């Protein structure tokens, strides 16, 4: 699978399998099936309430851990330096792993600076390979980049063919080559994206 190189040299698969809104009790099997068809990036979050099931899938698969890129996100109730550090340890336990490939701050509210400092320190300690944010607009991204010593590797935001956010892309590149990662790149299947004639023709000619 194609990868992108983050600004700290870590390789991230271009395509990830997100586990948001998978019904309780079905996440383990969904992740195993995703891995079986070739996905190597699994994206979860503390607020999804399914980290433990993702961990069960990672424990059950025969694919080595170092071949799987694992993302989770810190929820608002765990913001602040100490709370974030403690929540990462809890996520590691649920996910049955001793390191995380990418950890993001899920929303741009609350004590983002204290939380990001905690992620940076955990990155230095080797428990996280890459750190970043999610749902930060250009102004909030500029704040976190300007007032933190550690570089931001990723900003995961909503991007799809109907909402391309070209200015955000340019701004992220200017802020230390932060990678913009799309959530819901297929617009959650809405707006006729899979039957759109222009998009269908584009796929035919790729």
Question: What does each of the following model-derived ranges do?
Answer:
Residues 21, 46-48, 74-76, 109, ...:
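Active-site-proximal loop/turn and secondary-structure-junction residues that shape catalytic pockets
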Residues 204-206:
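Conserved small/polar residues in nucleotide/adenosyl-binding loops
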Residues 85-88, 113-118, 169-170, 192-200:
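Charged helix-capping and loop-helix junction motifs
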Residues 79-153, 157-160, 178:
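Glycine/proline-rich, positively charged
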Residues 156-161, 177-192:
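His/Asp/Glu-enriched short active-site or ligand-binding loop at hydrolase and phosphoryl-transfer sites
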Residues 1-68, 186:
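N-terminal binding-site loop/beta-alpha segment at the start of enzyme catalytic domains
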Residues 165-173:
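Anionic-ligand binding region
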Residues 17, 42, 54, 70, ...:
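Conserved, mostly hydrophobic/aromatic
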């Amino acid at each position: 699978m194609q990868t992108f190189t983050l600004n700290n040299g870590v390789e991230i698969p271009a395509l990830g399998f997100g586990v948001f809104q998978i019904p309780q009790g079905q996440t383990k099997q969904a992740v195993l099936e995703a891995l079986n068809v070739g996905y190597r990036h699994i994206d979860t979050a503390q607020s999804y309430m399914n980290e433990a099931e993702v961990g069960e899938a990672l424990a059950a698969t025969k694919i080595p851990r170092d071949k799987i890129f694992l993302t989770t996100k810190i929820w608002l109730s765990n913001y602040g330096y100490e709370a974030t550090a403690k929540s990462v340890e809890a996520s590691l336990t649920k996910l049955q792993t001793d390191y995380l490939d990418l950890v993001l701050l899920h929303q741009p509210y609350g004590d983002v600076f204290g939380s990001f400092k905690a992620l940076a320190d955990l990155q230095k300690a080797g428990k996280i390979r890459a750190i970043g944010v999610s749902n930060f607009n250009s102004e909030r991204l500029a704040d976190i980049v300007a007032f933190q010593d550690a570089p931001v590797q990723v900003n995961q935001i909503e991007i799809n063919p109907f909402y391309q956010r070209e200015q955000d892309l340019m701004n992220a590149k200017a802020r230390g080559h932060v990678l913009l990662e799309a959530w819901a790149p297929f617009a959650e299947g809405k707006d006729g994206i899979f039957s759109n004639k222009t998009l269908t023709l584009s796929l035919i000619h790729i």
